[in-house]
Amino acid sequence: MTDQSRTRFPQFYITAPQPCPYLLGRYEKKVFTHLLGDEPVSLNNALTQAGFRRSQNIAYRPACDDCQACVSVRVVVKDFQPGRTFRRILARNADLRSTPQPARATDEQYTLLRRYLDARHAEGGMADMSRLDYVAMVEDTTIATRLFEYRRPDGTLTAAALTDMLDDGLSMVYSFYEPGEPGRSLGTWMVLEHIERARALSLPYVYLGYWVDGSRKMAYKTRFRPLEALTMEGWRAHPAS
């Protein structure tokens, strides 16, 4: 087999069918490639624009036989205006301070992640994530990745977001937060914070991953409008917009 690291064109592979984590009774397949070679940053940029997501040093996208429910979506930053509910969430979290960190895992982050997973996703695919798994998720990257930490005035870590810095935007890879503060709506707030950060950096988009038609877990993404969806004709306005 050709060594991908010595070629300019990536080698793509496809997974065996696995139970779908979003739609009960469905099975998913993924096409993926390794972010290797001399230009992993430009490769990740191009693949993200083509609907791929990054997990460690792999870029993947759904390739299911009889289902197209997973749709890559991104927020159009310049046209986004927070409504009343979003403004309240922004005000509620005005005390939090954001610090961009290198992609380095810490015990403090992992402790917060465990509280989040145990409270919010105890039955999910990441429920058994170990400390070493977390280190791999954060640190196994060949591209420009940051881990944004959000802290209260007393220094307490309240939320964190693993984010890829792209040529045309920010891609939210994974985020987690303190589950004991539901009144803050921290998950929503981190998306809003990324939109404002992208605006300050003159970046046109915030990539939110996949909206899954029929999945309640992914329905929240349509609240951030205007939203674009990747279609067979390219990026177009999402129907919810």
Swiss-Prot record:
The keyword Acyltransferase applies. It comes from the Bacteria. Its main location: cytoplasm. InterPro entries: Acyl_CoA_acyltransferase (IPR016181), Asp_Glu_LeuTrfase (IPR017138), N-end_Aminoacyl_Trfase (IPR030700), N-end_Aminoacyl_Trfase_C (IPR007472), N-end_Aminoacyl_Trfase_N (IPR007471). Its EC number is 2.3.2.29. One of its GO terms (cellular component) is cytoplasm. It catalyses: N-terminal L-glutamyl-[protein] + L-leucyl-tRNA(Leu) = N-terminal L-leucyl-L-glutamyl-[protein] + tRNA(Leu) + H(+); N-terminal L-aspartyl-[protein] + L-leucyl-tRNA(Leu) = N-terminal L-leucyl-L-aspartyl-[protein] + tRNA(Leu) + H(+). This is Aspartate/glutamate leucyltransferase. It comes from Parvibaculum lavamentivorans (strain DS-1 / DSM 13023 / NCIMB 13966).
